[in-house]
Amino acid sequence: MEHKNTIIVNLFAGPGAGKSTGAAYVFAKLKLAGIDCEYVSEFAKDKVWENNSEVFKNQFYITGKQSFKISRCFGKVDVIITDSPIALGAVYADTEGLKLASLQEFNKYEKNNLNVFIERKKKYNPNGRNQTEEEAKEIDISVKKFLVNNNISFVSVYGDEEGYDVLVKTVKELLKK
């Protein structure tokens, strides 16, 4: 199997901002355009749907599982789209060591990352979430501060169809380079 120079589209924001919707939309649009891509879903969301609250006491485990989900596709497809970037593990980290480890793992892919902050546009849906709308908006602020404070370059798009279309166009342009 040939090793591909994979672009990782990392969607950042708090819960309910449209990361999963955007990831699914961008994935579908790219796939329909014949682009070899994969959607890497959020491990933590799987645990919410399983009613597994115990796992949320171990952010190290969650971050490791998410990292593995991304790494198993890296180099095998042209584009990975994820609604749970490895660096989000640092935002939710309960120790400084985990924060540093999450950032170090994320930075392994630095040359391949397209980091995107989703600006909240849609109505908040609490179903499948552990946070209230207010808490989710606070996490939006924390995530953006985290990106800025850690010198992680990113672009912002609105969490709506128009914003996701801009992202699809951006990815297609990057693939031409």
PLM segments and residue spans:
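Conserved lysine of the Walker
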Residues: 19
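A glycine- and Lys/Arg-enriched "phosphate-lid" helix/loop adjacent to the NTP-binding pocket
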Residues: 96-162, 166-175
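Conserved substrate/cofactor phosphate-moiety recognition/catalytic segment
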Residues: 27-68
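Hydrophobic positions on the alpha1 helix immediately C-terminal to the Walker A/P-loop
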Residues: 22
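Conserved nucleotide-sensing/catalytic segment adjacent to the nucleotide-binding pocket
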Residues: 52-98
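Phosphate-binding P-loop
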Residues: 1-8
